[in-house]
């Protein structure tokens, strides 16, 4: 049999609707996770955790077993005290014989304590005789009474008295005088302390004055104007620090001294021609030096 193949029928496709401003695409609302959590948690915030905790606890409690009591150490038998020897029975007669000497010894001691030796009666002095006083212990030396060396005049007293002189020999100093306590340190109000304070004060003031003087001198006479000079005096060379204002006087004194020495040498060597020539050379050199300076 021959079958005729018919062409496929075209599917009827509905025309696509054109989008307009009025039409809006509708999407399914997304379920939030919070709602599902809220549905699960029926017992507050940590309900799910509480369920897990319960299951864990139930498992642990099932595993637990009752603890066995610790083994007790075996009790040791108490140590027996060493047995004392049984007291021997002593008959009553023997006990009485043992106690007798002890009692007799006690009685003898009491008797010795009670025996008192009678003292002889003190002699009563007769009524007419006075008892002698006990001897007094005299001191090492008697202190001297303070007395004035000048005689009292008749103006003060009715009669004049003789002058009291010091004893010729003084007693030796005793060892007690060495250990006498010294005077305590004076207070601030004592004159000695005040004198010391004033002395220190004045010494400080003097030192301040000296410092002020040194400052004034350093201002009036600066150090760069000082220089050392030397001159001859009594056939000795003298060196001094001299201020520049006094230089002409020092130079003049040096010149006078040198001229004097030269004249003395010339007078001494007038007879010797060679020495005189040497002296003239020295004088010429000195004149050249002085002419160059001035």
Swiss-Prot record:
Pro residues bias locations: 118-136
Polar residues: compositionally biased ranges: 92-102
Biased composition annotated in UniProt, kind: Low complexity: 79-88, 145-160
Basic residues compositional bias, start-end: 27-43, 50-78
Residues covered by region (Disordered): 1-215
Protein name according to UniProt: Uncharacterized protein C45G9.9
Organism: Caenorhabditis elegans
Biological classification of the source: Eukaryota, Metazoa, Ecdysozoa, Nematoda, Chromadorea
């Amino acid at each position: 049999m021959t079958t005729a193949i018919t062409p496929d029928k075209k599917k009827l496709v509905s025309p696509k609707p054109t989008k307009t401003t009025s039409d809006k695409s509708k999407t399914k609302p997304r379920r939030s996770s919070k709602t599902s959590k809220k549905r699960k948690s029926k017992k507050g915030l940590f309900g799910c955790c509480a369920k897990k905790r319960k299951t864990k606890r139930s498992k642990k409690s099932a595993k637990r077993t009752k603890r066995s009591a610790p083994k007790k150490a075996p009790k040791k038998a108490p140590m027996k005290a060493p047995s004392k020897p049984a007291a021997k029975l002593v008959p009553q007669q023997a006990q009485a014989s043992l106690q007798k000497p002890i009692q007799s010894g006690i009685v003898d001691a009491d008797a010795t304590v009670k025996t008192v030796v009678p003292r002889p009666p003190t002699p009563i002095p007769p009524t007419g005789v006075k008892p002698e006083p006990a001897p007094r212990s005299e001191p090492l030396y008697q202190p001297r009474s303070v007395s004035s060396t000048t005689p009292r005049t008749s103006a003060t007293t009715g009669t004049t008295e003789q002058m009291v002189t010091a004893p010729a020999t003084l007693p030796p100093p005793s060892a007690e005088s060495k250990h006498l306590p010294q005077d305590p340190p004076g207070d601030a109000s004592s004159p000695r302390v005040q004198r010391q304070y004033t002395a220190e004060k004045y010494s400080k003031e003097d030192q301040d004055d000296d410092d002020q003087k040194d400052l004034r001198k350093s201002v009036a006479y600066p150090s760069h104007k000082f220089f050392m000079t030397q001159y001859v005096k009594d056939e000795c060379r003298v060196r001094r620090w001299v201020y520049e204002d006094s230089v002409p006087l020092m130079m003049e004194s040096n010149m006078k001294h040198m001229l004097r020495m030269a004249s003395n040498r010339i007078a001494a060597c007038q007879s010797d021609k060679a020495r005189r020539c040497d002296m003239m050379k020295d004088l010429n050199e000195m004149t050249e030096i002085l002419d160059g300076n001035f």
